[in-house]
Amino acid sequence: MAEKKSVLKVLRETSRLKTREERIDNLRANESWLLKDIIRMNFDEAVVCILPEGMPDVELKKTKDATSTIEAHYDNFRYFFQTQWADKIKNFDRQNRFLQLLQEIPAGEAEMLCKAKDKKMKYVGITKKLCQEAFPGLIVK
């Protein structure tokens, strides 16, 4: 069985492909809840982040020094956006969870996540329209 690629790797790989069909096929071939949620964070106006905008002032880890992956923190995402769970923790705790996540994952993943939450993630050829075609019904607004 092939090793599961990180979302960052899938996005970078997809952006290097030449045709729209190849990009759609690659996104679909690497479909995961995390990939789709990162795409929704970035492109769906219905997904509203309740964290401060921008990259917090934290020391990011090189990939070899990272102690965790973005996947390991996936359950915390529900607290970072306007959801039914967001009100269950205090803003201070929410921000601390986010900072801890950023300090444990590789720098590339941390930067990707911060750009996606701010709706500023950009990869050549990966557009809202392309993602809507790859995953119909995923992006609501």
Feature-to-residue mapping (PLM):
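N-terminal nucleic-acid-engaging modules of covalent nucleotidyltransferase systems
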Residues: 1-141
